[in-house]
């Protein structure tokens, strides 16, 4: 821990806490301060000027990052019949119906990262709301995970689709890749994500929409980005 603390202290010296950086500068600094021996995840934290307690100020959606996230995503699909076969052919990791309902409820099984469901299966999936909801795993039409086009949903997810949604403090946390991606690929992923979030601004939102944003690696310090210049 002492060694990691030393690396963190060295990283902090590269960043001016009172400065707001351009996206390109922030990504560059984040890569320079990612000193862990593993391939660190690069994550964005965005605080929005909305009230998540109001339904008309929710911000939620999904976007396919051009270079993915660098993470192998395990997909569970709730479907039957031809749609189940379609899901299997499209590369879903797990496909089924009530048997996975039982597995999750009785075995506390969560060896998956994304859940996709055909609309006719939401009666089954809805019974898992209490366990899937808090983990951010509940399928949702807005994010394209409740659909009859399961092949496209799976393809998008495997290609690097990420979901974004507000937490209770009006902050969105989203990974945009790995340190190994390099500055150019991270910047392209960053731009695609931020364009989607800007477009998702609720009509009911008043005042400054993007209050603050920062970027960091798994073990590195946060680097503040100027909210007035959100695109790289």
Swiss-Prot record:
Q: Which organism is it from?
A: Clostridium novyi (strain NT)
PANTHER family, A to Z: 54S RIBOSOMAL PROTEIN L1, MITOCHONDRIAL, LARGE RIBOSOMAL SUBUNIT PROTEIN UL1M
* UniProt-recorded Gene Ontology molecular function terms: rRNA binding; structural constituent of ribosome; tRNA binding
Q: Which NCBIfam families match?
A: rplA_bact (TIGR01169)
Tell me the first and last residues of the signal peptide.
Answer: none
Picking any one GO biological process from the record gives: translation
Q: List the disulfide bonds.
A: none
Its protein name is Large ribosomal subunit protein uL1
One Gene Ontology term, aspect cellular component:
large ribosomal subunit
In terms of CDD domains, this protein maps to: Ribosomal_L1 (cd00403)
Subunit structure comment from the entry: Part of the 50S ribosomal subunit.
Physiological role: Binds directly to 23S rRNA. The L1 stalk is quite mobile in the ribosome, and is involved in E site tRNA release.
Per its UniProt record, what PROSITE patterns does this chain match? RIBOSOMAL_L1
């Amino acid at each position: 821990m002492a060694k990691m603390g030393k690396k963190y202290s060295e990283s902090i010296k590269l960043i001016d806490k009172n400065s707001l950086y351009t996206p390109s500068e922030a990504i560059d600094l984040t890569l320079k301060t990612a000193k862990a021996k593993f391939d660190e995840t690069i994550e964005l934290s965005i605080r929005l000027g909305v009230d998540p307690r109001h339904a008309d100020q929710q911000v939620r959606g999904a976007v396919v990052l051009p270079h993915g996230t660098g993470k192998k995503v395990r997909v569970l699909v709730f479907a039957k019949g031809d749609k189940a076969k379609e899901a299997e052919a499209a590369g879903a990791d797990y496909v089924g119906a009530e048997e996975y309902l039982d597995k999750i409820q009785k075995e506390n099984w969560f060896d998956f990262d994304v859940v996709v469901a055909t609309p006719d299966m939401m009666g089954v999936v809805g019974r898992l709301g209490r366990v899937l909801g808090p983990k951010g795993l509940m399928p949702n039409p807005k994010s394209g995970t409740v659909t009859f086009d399961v092949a496209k949903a799976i393809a998008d997810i495997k290609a690097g689709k990420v979901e974004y949604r507000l937490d209770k403090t009006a902050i969105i946390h989203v990974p945009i890749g790995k340190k190994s991606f390099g500055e150019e690929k991270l910047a392209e992923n960053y731009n695609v994500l931020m364009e989607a979030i800007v477009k998702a601004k609720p009509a009911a939102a008043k005042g400054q929409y993007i209050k603050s944003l920062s970027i960091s690696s798994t073990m590195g310090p946060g680097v503040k980005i100027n909210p007035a210049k959100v695109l790289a």
